């Protein structure tokens, strides 16, 4: 029987500091009503001074390992999705690897912005299916507060910091009845790179830069691309929207999430929504939302869980999981 990646456990970490919409009114010209109406966001977490992406990632990884009942020394692959690494190099994943006391296997970063966790999950899944890894840590971690222009009210109100992680283990399985990742689907279209980007980098400006976004254009592409990749994932497994137990989308904007759910004819009660208290945490948003739904008892053994995201590039993707 072929190998399949089973999610054994998940973990999350959110910085202690909470920044509310009311707090933001003292930084930029905005209001709670303006932000909630357009995004659904009420608050977000912000990393403390000296608290880096690797710190968030490590905390989420430790929580995931504990939840899975897996010892760190069993891990032979770490794939960390982030657009806000500690340094240009080495990979933030290698820092996490060292802090966990892991000295074997591979550890590397993946950069697909808000789609990063789905990309990282797909990569780890394929390592496992190929027999090149047995136990993988997949992490999404971001400190987007460090790349925001805090004078731009159209972007600084959207993002937050955090990290989420899952532990994958190779197990035998096939078909849609067995537990594990059923399929992953990745896409990108670089023609639209200038609609969502950071205006800095080591080879261009030698600076970190700030996030820039043409929000309305991103929204239009997101609604279409996410609907298509979700349909692709369902068709690949001979399933219909009615078979989905839970939709765990990238938490970018409540309007995008609700639009995707409507296209799938999914009742809102089956959509995991955390954007109101997390904001957009980029690659961390899906594992943070998934972990919340697992730990509060919504996601149960045997459920079909659909993950989907779109990010800068554009990149987008979906993963279908039998929990």
Curated annotation (Swiss-Prot):
Top EC class for this record: transferase
Pathway of action: Lipid metabolism; fatty acid biosynthesis
Annotated spans, ACP-binding: 251-255
PANTHER family with a match to the protein in the record: 3-OXOACYL-[ACYL-CARRIER-PROTEIN] SYNTHASE (PTHR43091), BETA-KETOACYL-[ACYL-CARRIER-PROTEIN] SYNTHASE III, CHLOROPLASTIC (PTHR43091:SF1)
Domain of life: Bacteria
NCBIfam families assigned: fabH (TIGR00747), PRK09352.1 (NF006829)
Signal sequence, start to end: none
HAMAP family: FabH (MF_01815)
Name of protein: Beta-ketoacyl-[acyl-carrier-protein] synthase III
Catalytic activity line of the entry: malonyl-[ACP] + acetyl-CoA + H(+) = 3-oxobutanoyl-[ACP] + CO2 + CoA
UniProt KW keywords: Acyltransferase, Cytoplasm, Fatty acid biosynthesis, Fatty acid metabolism, Lipid biosynthesis, Lipid metabolism, Multifunctional enzyme, Transferase
GO cellular component: cytoplasm
Record localization: Cytoplasm
Record note on quaternary structure: Homodimer.
A biological process from GO: fatty acid biosynthetic process
Any one Gene Ontology molecular-function term assigned to this protein's record: 3-oxoacyl-[acyl-carrier-protein] synthase activity
Recorded family membership: Belongs to the thiolase-like superfamily. FabH family.
Role: Catalyzes the condensation reaction of fatty acid synthesis by the addition to an acyl acceptor of two carbons from malonyl-ACP. Catalyzes the first condensation reaction which initiates fatty acid synthesis and may therefore play a role in governing the total rate of fatty acid production. Possesses both acetoacetyl-ACP synthase and acetyl transacylase activities. Its substrate specificity determines the biosynthesis of branched-chain and/or straight-chain of fatty acids.
Gene3D superfamilies: 3.40.47.10
EC annotation from Swiss-Prot or TrEMBL: 2.3.1.180
Source species taxonomy: Bacteria, Pseudomonadati, Pseudomonadota, Alphaproteobacteria, Rhodospirillales
InterPro entries: ACP_syn_III_C (IPR013747), ACP_syn_III_N (IPR013751), FabH (IPR004655), Thiolase-like (IPR016039)
Domain topic, free-text comment: The last Arg residue of the ACP-binding site is essential for the weak association between ACP/AcpP and FabH.
Active site: 114, 250, 280
């Amino acid at each position: 029987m072929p190998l399949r990646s089973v999610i054994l456990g998940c973990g999350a970490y959110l910085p202690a500091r909470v920044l509310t919409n009311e707090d933001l009114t003292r930084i930029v010209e905005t209001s709670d009503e303006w932000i909630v109406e357009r995004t659904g966001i009420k608050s977000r977490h912000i990393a403390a001074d000296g608290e880096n992406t690797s710190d968030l990632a490590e905390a989420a990884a430790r929580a995931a390992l504990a939840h899975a009942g897996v010892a760190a020394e069993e891990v032979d692959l770490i794939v960390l999705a982030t657009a806000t690494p500690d340094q240009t190099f080495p990979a933030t994943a290698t820092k996490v690897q060292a802090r966990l006391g892991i000295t074997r296997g591979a550890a590397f970063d993946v950069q697909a912005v808000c789609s990063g966790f789905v990309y990282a999950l797909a990569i780890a899944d394929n390592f496992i299916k190929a027999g090149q890894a047995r136990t993988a840590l997949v992490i999404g971690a971001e400190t987007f507060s460090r790349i925001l222009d805090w004078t731009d009210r159209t972007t600084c109100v959207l993002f937050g910091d955090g990290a989420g992680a899952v532990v994958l283990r190779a197990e035998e399985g096939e078909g849609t009845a067995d537990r594990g990742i059923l399929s992953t689907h990745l896409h990108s279209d670089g023609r639209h790179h200038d609609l969502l980007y950071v205006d800095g980098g080591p080879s261009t400006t030698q600076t970190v830069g700030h996030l820039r976004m043409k929000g309305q254009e991103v929204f239009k592409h997101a609604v279409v691309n996410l609907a298509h990749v979700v349909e692709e994932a369902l068709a690949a497994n001979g399933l219909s929207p009615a078979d989905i137990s839970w939709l765990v989308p990238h938490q970018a904007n409540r309007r995008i999430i609700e639009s995707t759910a409507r296209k799938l004819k999914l009742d809102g009660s089956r959509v995991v929504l955390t954007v109101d208290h997390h904001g957009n945490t980029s690659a961390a948003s899906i594992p943070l939302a998934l972990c919340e739904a697992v730990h509060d008892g919504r996601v149960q053994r045997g459920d079909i869980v659909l993950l989907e995201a779109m990010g800068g590039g554009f990149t987008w993707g979906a993963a279908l999981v039998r929990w």
